[in-house]
């Protein structure tokens, strides 16, 4: 599903002395099956922005279009129910939302709540377990007996059971160890590639942005400051640092190597890109000495 924000402004407690404008005139587009990363320091408006996508918050002014759905300040909650079946939200620490007695029941809750027959919802829950990399031995276990990483997979399976076409991820790897973070990001990449989901990712992990995102939106004090490819956004380290951000670690390391005389055809953003460039450098040096 394609997404378009058109001059979106959002003010908390509008019309009161406590009014605070968290988004100002944000416009951006994400193509169908696109992968957008949203970055920015704490308080920049990232979470407020993504909560507009299934109208947990509705814009104070402006319009959001998600395929045939349109969200405006006047959109009614009744009109939003079909949209919310298509937009899946994974918040920070989603395992805190688990509540059913068994893993299978927890995953099946959403589909049943939207009218799916119990038997179909339970069968779908088993399918989603496999999708997130858990076997059927987990189905009848209490979700509260699982490890933190397993609980998070169950929570994500519950979102996927709604069969969304857009998956919105708010710091989905927060609190995970490096291996768990990599496994989670690979899962989302597989869903993006194999199921054609449109992904919107909020993260502080610049390595994940460089590795997976096709577009990057930089938020600062509620405004969209930059929008482009990872290569575009990470091309100016000084500008990023002015906005309390930095380039990925591979780019930082490449800069140190460049200071020592190595050259790169273009800025490496991932460890794989850096390794490839270094291998080419060593191969060329070897050929020059033959």
From Swiss-Prot:
CDD domains: ABC_cobalt_CbiO_domain1. One of its GO terms (cellular component) is ATP-binding cassette (ABC) transporter complex. The lineage of its organism: Bacteria, Bacillati, Bacillota, Bacilli, Lactobacillales. It holds the Pfam family ABC_tran. ATP-binding (A) component of a common energy-coupling factor (ECF) ABC-transporter complex. Unlike classic ABC transporters this ECF transporter provides the energy necessary to transport a number of different substrates. Forms a stable energy-coupling factor (ECF) transporter complex composed of 2 membrane-embedded substrate-binding proteins (S component), 2 ATP-binding proteins (A component) and 2 transmembrane proteins (T component). InterPro entries: AAA+_ATPase, ABC_transporter-like_ATP-bd, ABC_transporter-like_CS, ABC_transpr_CbiO/EcfA_su, ECF_ABC_transporter_ATP-bd, EcfA2, P-loop_NTPase. Gene3D superfamilies: P-loop containing nucleotide triphosphate hydrolases. Belongs to the ABC transporter superfamily. Energy-coupling factor EcfA family. Residues 3-246 form the ABC transporter domain. Its EC number is 7.-.-.-. ATP binds at residues 40-47. GO terms for molecular function: ATP binding; ATP hydrolysis activity; ATPase-coupled transmembrane transporter activity. SUPFAM superfamilies: P-loop containing nucleoside triphosphate hydrolases. It is a peripheral membrane protein. PANTHER family: ENERGY-COUPLING FACTOR TRANSPORTER ATP-BINDING PROTEIN ECFA2, HEAVY METAL TRANSPORTER. It is found in: Cell membrane. This is Energy-coupling factor transporter ATP-binding protein EcfA2. Keywords: ATP-binding, Cell membrane, Membrane, Nucleotide-binding, Translocase, Transport. It comes from Levilactobacillus brevis (strain ATCC 367 / BCRC 12310 / CIP 105137 / JCM 1170 / LMG 11437 / NCIMB 947 / NCTC 947).
């Amino acid at each position: 599903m394609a997404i378009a924000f058109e001059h979106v402004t959002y003010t908390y407690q509008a019309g009161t002395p406590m009014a605070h404008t968290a988004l100002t005139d944000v416009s951006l587009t994400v193509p169908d099956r696109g992968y957008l990363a949203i970055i920015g320091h704490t308080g920049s408006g990232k979470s407020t922005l993504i909560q507009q996508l299934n109208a947990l918050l509705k814009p104070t002014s402006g319009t959001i279009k998600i395929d045939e759905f349109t969200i405006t300040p006047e959109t009614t909650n009744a009109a939003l129910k079909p949209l919310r079946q298509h937009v899946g939200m994974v918040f920070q620490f989603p395992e805190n939302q688990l509540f059913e007695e068994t893993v299978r029941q927890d995953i099946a809750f959403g589909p049943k709540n939207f009218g799916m027959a119990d038997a179909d919802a339970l069968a779908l829950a088993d399918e989603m377990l496999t999708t997130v990399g858990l076997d059927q031995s987990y189905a009848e276990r209490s979700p509260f007996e699982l490890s933190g990483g397993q609980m998070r997979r169950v929570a994500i399976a519950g979102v996927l059971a709604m069969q969304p076409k857009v998956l919105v991820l708010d710091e989905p790897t927060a609190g995970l160890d490096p291996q768990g973070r990599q496994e989670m990001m690979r899962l989302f990449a597989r869903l993006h590639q194999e199921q054609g989901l449109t992904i919107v990712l909020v993260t502080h992990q610049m390595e994940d942005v460089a590795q997976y995102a096709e577009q990057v939106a930089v938020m600062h004090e509620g405004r969209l400051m930059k929008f482009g490819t990872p290569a575009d956004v990470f091309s100016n380290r000084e500008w990023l640092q002015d906005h309390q951000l930095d380039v990925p670690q591979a780019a930082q390391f490449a800069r140190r190597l460049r200071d020592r005389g190595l050259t790169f055809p273009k800025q490496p953003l991932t460890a794989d890109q850096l390794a490839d460039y270094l291998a080419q450098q060593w191969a060329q040096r070897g050929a020059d000495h033959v």
